[in-house]
Every structure is written in structure tokens, then in C-alpha cells.
A protein has these predicted regions:
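N-terminal secretory signal peptides
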Residues: 1-10, 18-30, 34
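Blade-edge beta-strand/turn elements of extracellular beta-propeller
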Residues: 38-44, 85-93, 100-105, 141-158, ...
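Hydrophobic core segments of beta-strands in well-ordered, beta-rich domains
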Residues: 55-70, 77, 108, 113-133, ...
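Beta-propeller domains
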Residues: 65-92
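Structural motif
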Residues: 72-73, 137-139, 183-186, 232-236, ...
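Conserved Ser/Thr-centered positions that define the repeating blades of beta-propeller domains
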Residues: 79, 142-143, 187, 236-240, ...
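Conserved blade-ending motifs and adjacent loop-strand segments that build the rim/top face
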Residues: 250-268, 497-503
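Extracellular glycan-recognition regions
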Residues: 296, 304-306, 310-536
Length: 536
């Protein structure tokens, strides 16, 4: 089911090395009165959440997104108003899909969790996540609460590429999937097996590629909502049942988006509010930060076709807020301080590939014991990441480095296929704070550069504070800068600005990343006593 790189202008997710992203976040300051906000501003979440699926269960909205090589995968976002979002959990607790996701002999960069689907089944009050991995098979995970626990229900031999799961009004389960040729599968009543699949639509050559299926039944009609990567959205409609025949209509094409320098809103899904209004939660290409969710109201023609409501011919930067009941509580902001108390990581965090769980712990800070001996950060296990908040944000880490050993490297990175970091190195008993740049990959995601030091300074034995500031406004490469402090108050800039590229091909955007790896021998450790993600 993979396609060649020569067709990338038609579909930007067509090779083994290509894929898709996620959805979540809060835009307005925490504590802003929901009732007082008569309008909202796009993007509703300025963080990297692509390939969104969105549903409502009662008075709560949930969204799912791609995560590729990050673990746990497939975050579930929660909102009470479609505007303010939090991360509630992850549908895929561990990337249990082969050794490469453990960085064991091979690597899973830009593989893993691509566009997938989230649904709720009222008959058994269960959430379902369904997605294909590595074009080999489809996995289904279920939970009775989005926080988890999520458990694998089944694997299905057909890889449902870009799947949309529909729970029909008679409780039947259907999956729409495919690239250009769109198919519909019916699952067994228990959701464990495929009982039927057939092609239902072939995309006209004049349109090119359609993928990213979302599957709906609305007023007795069946709809498959499809994207033309990365500048269009189309919809198929059938009045004859889930297997068609379907007719196609364009929803949007080359529509001006709400973010200066960003792309066309596309993909994502439709959701209906309690009062019957409809909204489209799409994403906007906004590199170097990734793909960020944008929300627009939708109306319907008399003959049952969706129409996105525009502002001056474009996807609005602002719209009237959805009319929804007062939220039962404020959502947890996606920025702020984490002191790593308790027994688990908060769901805002995702590891680069699966972690070695014997080598980290939380409670009284985050302890990272070295898990890998390598000079290549891209091979190092237990690198812990957070999405960057746009348009600009700063990550500050308080680091206890007293248990580092010779050869260890620990710090704070701006992580993507071209990376840089500020951190503490210990060599020959000497501890320094350094900036390293030149960590690079090729387009097959193999390491081409392990980095080189561009600045350094001595540090005393006490804690050190490391800071990275990232500008992720789209449309051009943007600067990331690093600084450090020995008292937590006065910060000193270290090294030149790092240019974060805005090419889309890694799919996932830049992230802040905490790391600690050995270059000589295991046994060292660091403790992160405080992390803060802040905006100007």
C-alpha cells in the first residue's frame, strides 16, 4: 500500500518513511471565563496534533491524533467546548509493534501511529481506537474511560490505511479506508474480525489523491470525509447504505488558512454539538512547529452536503464560540510547571520511541538513568518530549547533575530530524554546560550527523538551569536559542541561534526533549526537579 516519493506532490504520506501527526491544547489563558468568550481564535490549539478524529460523548468532546514514533501513542484530547483542550490519555500505551520501536537494532522514526480513528460505542459504553501499523495489519484498542487503561482488543490482517471507524445506529461497525481507492470494511459484532470489505469509490484523476477517511451516518445518509493532501477536502455521500454507491463533492480547495505563513486547513473530522450545530476540526501545516488544529462552523445544504462557513473567503481567524453548556471544570492547561510528583508521568509527555522503564522514575522529580551507550542522540533511549506551544514558547529545566559519570550527556534539545541541544557534559571529571548543533538525519531517517560543540562554559557542582526558546511561526525557518543559569534567576545565552527548518517531510514538528545518555558506560543519572513550559 505504499506509494513512491515521485508522487509526493499528490500525497505527502506515501512511502514507508512518510506519515502523519496529532491534536490537543488550550489557546486562551488558563482561567479565562468560558462564558465571557463570545468568540474563539484559530488555531484552537497551537501545538502539533495532526490527523485529528473528533467525537462527542454526552457533554464531552474527544479528539485523537497521530504520534508516529512517540510513545505512548495516539493521545486522546478532551474538551467541553471544542476550543479549550487538554490531553487526557493515550490509546496506545506502548508501541508494541517490533524491536525498532525500542531502538533495538533498528529505528521507527516516522513510522508507528499514523492517521487512525477514535470512536465510542454506546451499546457497551466503550471507546475504540483503530489504526494500521507499518502497512502490515490493523490494531484495535479499547477502554471504558479515555484515561485508560487501554487494552489491545484484536489485530486484523487487513491494514486499514487512514481509517475512519463508524459505529452505526444499529451498532454495526464499519471502517472506511484507503488511498485514492476507498474501501469499506464491516467488522464482526465483537469488533475482532473483518467479515466483509469492498471498494466503494475510485478517486477521479482530476482530483488526484484522496485519503484520511472519516466515516459518518447523518440523517440516514452515509458520508466518507476525505482529504486531498495537503490543500483540499472532499466528501462522499451514499443514500443506499455503507457500501454505496457514493457521489463526491468538493468541500474546500486551496482555501486561505487562519495562520499567516501556514497551510490550507484540511483532514480532521466533523462533530455535532448538543444543540445540533456542526463544526469541522481540521489541521493546518505550520512548520517548524508541526500541524495544528483549527475549528470552523459547518452548515448543510438542503440536499445534505456540508459547507464550511468562511470569513471573507477564508477559514476565519475568529468565529463565535460554540453554544455549549457551561463546562464542569477548567481543562488542564498545556503549558505550566511540572515537578514530576506522583507515580506516573502526566499525559503531556511522550517518549522518543518506547522507554526502558527500568531506567527512569518519577516522584520528587524525574530521574533519568542512562539507558544507552551511544554518541548519537537519535539512538538514545529514554528521551522525553513535550510539544512546543506556538507561536513562541520557552522550556526551562532545573537539573541535578551530581550523579553523572564520565562520558555522560544530559540536557534539553530542540528535537527533530535536524536538532540542537544545551546540556551538561562530564569528561575526565570536568563538568561543563555546552551547546551542540549539527544532529541531522537524511530523508530515510538515518543519522548523518551526531553533532558538534559550538559553545561551552564551566558550571559549579550545584544544580543548573537549562532553557530553550523556540519560535515556531510558520512560513520560514525560525530560530531556537539556548541559555543557562546557576541560580535560576539570571540566564546567560550560550551559542548561536539554531535554525529550525520548516520542511514538512518529518511530519512531526519540533519538540522540547529531555535526555540523558552515556558515551562510555552506563551507571550515571540526572534528576529533573522542575520543568516549565511558558509563553511570553
Amino acid at each position: 500500500m505504499h506509494m513512491s516519493w515521485t508522487q509526493q506532490h499528490l500525497s505527502r504520506r506515501r512511502a514507508l518513511t512518510a506519515a502523519t501527526g496529532m491534536v490537543a491544547g488550550a489557546l486562551l489563558p488558563h482561567g479565562a471565563a468560558h462564558a465571557a468568550a463570545s468568540t474563539y481564535t484559530n488555531p484552537v490549539i497551537w501545538q502539533d496534533f495532526a490527523d485529528i478524529d473528533v467525537i462527542r460523548v454526552g457533554d464531552t468532546y474527544y479528539a485523537s491524533a497521530s504520534t508516529m514514533h512517540y510513545s505512548p501513542g495516539a493521545p486522546v484530547l478532551r474538551s467541553y467546548d471544542l476550543v479549550h483542550w487538554e490531553i487526557a490519555g493515550h490509546s496506545v500505551p506502548v508501541l508494541d509493534f517490533g524491536a525498532k520501536y525500542d531502538l533495538n537494532g533498528s529505528r521507527g522514526y516516522v513510522r508507528g501511529i499514523w492517521a487512525s480513528s477514535l470512536a465510542y460505542r454506546p451499546s457497551n459504553r466503550t471507546f475504540y481506537w483503530l489504526g494500521q501499523i507499518d502497512f502490515t495489519r490493523t490494531y484495535v484498542y479499547t477502554a471504558t474511560a479515555v484515561e485508560g487503561p487501554w487494552n489491545r482488543l484484536t489485530t486484523i490482517g487487513t491494514p486499514y490505511y487512514d481509517a475512519g471507524l463508524l459505529v452505526d445506529t444499529d451498532d454495526s461497525l464499519y471502517v472506511a479506508y484507503g488511498n485514492t481507492t476507498i474501501s469499506v470494511a464491516q467488522l464482526s459484532p465483537d469488533g475482532r474480525n473483518q467479515v466483509r470489505t469492498q471498494q466503494v469509490f475510485t478517486t477521479p484523476s482530476s482530483v488526484g489523491t484522496l485519503e484520511g477517511s472519516r466515516f459518518y451516518k447523518i440523517n440516514g445518509q452515509y458520508y466518507i470525509f476525505l482529504t486531498r493532501p495537503a490543500n483540499g477536502q472532499y466528501v462522499l455521500k451514499s443514500s443506499s447504505g455503507p457500501f454505496g454507491p457514493y457521489t463526491m463533492r468538493q468541500v474546500l480547495l486551496d482555501l486561505r488558512g487562519p495562520i499567516p505563513g501556514g497551510g490550507v486547513p484540511h483532514q480532521g473530522g466533523l462533530v455535532q454539538t448538543q444543540s445540533g450545530a456542526w463544526y469541522y476540526l481540521a489541521f493546518v501545516d505550520a512548520y517548524p512547529g508541526g500541524r495544528v488544529p483549527a475549528l470552523a462552523p459547518v452548515t448543510w445544504t438542503s440536499d445534505g452536503w456540508p459547507v464550511v462557513q468562511l470569513v471573507d473567503g477564508a477559514w476565519g481567524t475568529s468565529y463565535p464560540s460554540p453554544a455549549v453548556p457551561s463546562p464542569p471544570r477548567q481543562v488542564t492547561p498545556m503549558t505550566g510547571v511540572d515537578t514530576f510528583d506522583g507515580t506516573t508521568l502526566k499525559p503531556n509527555w511522550e517518549w522518543n520511541h518506547n522507554p526502558d522503564n527500568a531506567k527512569w522514575s518519577v516522584g520528587n522529580g524525574l530521574t533519568l538513568r542512562t539507558a544507552t551507550v551511544t554518541n548519537d542522540l537519535y539512538w538514545a533511549r529514554n528521551t522525553l518530549t513535550r510539544r512546543i506551544q506556538g507561536p513562541t514558547s520557552t522550556a526551562t529545566v532545573q537539573l541535578d547533575h551530581s550523579a553523572m559519570r564520565d562520558g555522560d550527556r544530559a540536557g534539553l534539545a530542540l528535537l527533530r530530524d535536524s536538532s540542537a541541544w544545551i546540556g551538561v557534559t562530564r569528561d575526565g571529571g570536568v563538568t561543563r554546560v555546552v551547546m551542540v548543533t549539527g544532529l541531522t538525519m537524511d530523508t530515510n531517517w538515518n543519522t548523518t550527523g551526531t553533532g558538534y560543540e559550538v559553545a561551552s562554559a564551566p558550571v559549579p557542582g550545584g544544580p543548573v538551569w537549562l532553557r530553550a526558546t523556540a519560535d515556531i511561526r510558520p512560513g520560514a525557518p525560525r530560530p531556537g536559542t539556548f541559555s543557562y543559569s546557576t541560580d535560576g534567576t539570571t540566564f546567560t545565552r550560550l551559542g548561536p541561534a539554531f535554525s529550525m527548518g520548516n520542511d514538512w517531510r518529518f511530519f512531526m514538528g519540533y519538540r522540547f526533549a529531555l535526555f540523558n545518555h552515556a558515551t562510555q558506560a552506563l551507571g550515571g543519572a540526572v534528576r529533573v526537579t522542575r520543568f516549565e513550559l511558558s509563553t511570553p
